[in-house]
Design a protein with these regions (language model features):
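C-terminal helical subdomain
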Residues: 181, 197, 201-233, 240-242
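Active-site helix of classical SDR
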Residues: 122, 158, 166
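Residue(s) in the substrate-gating loop at a strand-loop-helix junction
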Residues: 142
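Alpha-helical segment proximal to the catalytic Tyr-Lys
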Residues: 127, 170-175, 231
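Conserved glycine-rich cofactor-binding loop
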Residues: 10, 17-18
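Substrate-binding pocket helix/loop in short-chain dehydrogenase/reductase
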Residues: 97-99, 103-111, 203
Length: 258
């Protein structure tokens, strides 16, 4: 087994029917891992799993539904016998605009999905398996958790908090469980579409490496962090952004601001 080989390990990835989540599921499966991916609907979860292979199981589970999360963990243990990797990828941003324009309903939704759900899934996985046997957790945060971005204050606040939760969990769960965050920059996903779709050329030129990221760019980093090659890494927030935030803060703005 090489240090990047994931054979014999089992991963749960939330929100993995498309985009970064799907790319991570594909990459981990290619590395030999069994993968359980979740989506909000059974149809989307099954379709995503079918794209990848026989060692992948799709399950319907809304990120904040604790009963669904428990069921997913139970089924994973019954089917594959372990939970070695958890990637908390599910996220939402229903709240573009100024912070002073937000209401409690929006606040509650974005914090529940982006912050509470990763903590809940981690807690359940630790109690069911990882606490005794070890494992690796990745929380998908954002460069927005480290740098200001116009009109995304509430989303960014959840990602800043998630980075702090990641570090706290890394401390509390050591030495059995490693916990890290990945902070993607602008990636070609449906969630981020409003930030680049109508201005791809100028946005790309503002990134040091000259292009918007692809989901596979994040997937490669995730595969490294959950592997033995990263066995001495915990509590880190790894930025994967093509040099987007080198120098000044990001210059792009969401088209819906007007």
């Amino acid at each position: 087994m090489t240090s990047l080989d994931l054979a014999g390990r089992t991963a749960i990835i939330t929100g993995a029917s498309r985009g970064i989540g799907l790319a991570m599921a594909q990459r981990l499966a290619e590395g030999g891992a069994n993968v359980v991916l979740t989506a909000r609907s059974e149809e989307r979860a099954a379709a995503a799993a079918a794209q990848i292979g026989s060692n992948v199981l799709g399950m319907a589970a809304h990120a904040v539904d604790e009963d669904a999360a428990r069921h997913c963990i139970d089924v994973t243990l019954e089917r594959f016998g372990s939970i070695d990797i958890l990637i908390n990828n599910a996220g939402t941003n229903p709240a573009y605009g100024l912070l002073t324009e937000q209401d409690h309903a929006r606040f509650a939704k974005v914090f529940d999905v982006n912050l509470w759900a990763p903590l809940m899934w981690t807690s359940l996985a630790v109690k069911a398996w990882m606490g005794e046997r070890g494992g690796s957790v990745i929380n998908i945060a954002s460069v927005g958790g480290l740098h200001l971005t116009p009109s995304m204050g509430m989303y960014n606040a959840t990602k800043t908090a998630l980075i702090q939760v990641t570090k706290q969990l890394a401390l509390e769960l050591s030495p059995k469980v490693r916990v890290n965050a990945i902070c993607p920059g602008l990636v070609r996903t449906r969630l981020a579409e409003g930030l680049w779709k109508e201005q791809e050329d100028p946005v790309s030129s503002s990134i040091a490496l000259g292009r918007i990221g692809e989901p596979v760019d994040v997937a490669g980093a995730a595969a490294f962090l959950v592997s033995d090659a990263a066995s001495w890494i915990t509590g880190e927030a790894m930025v994967i952004d093509g040099g987007q935030v080198l120098g000044d803060a990001p210059t792009f703005r969401r088209n819906a601001d007007d």
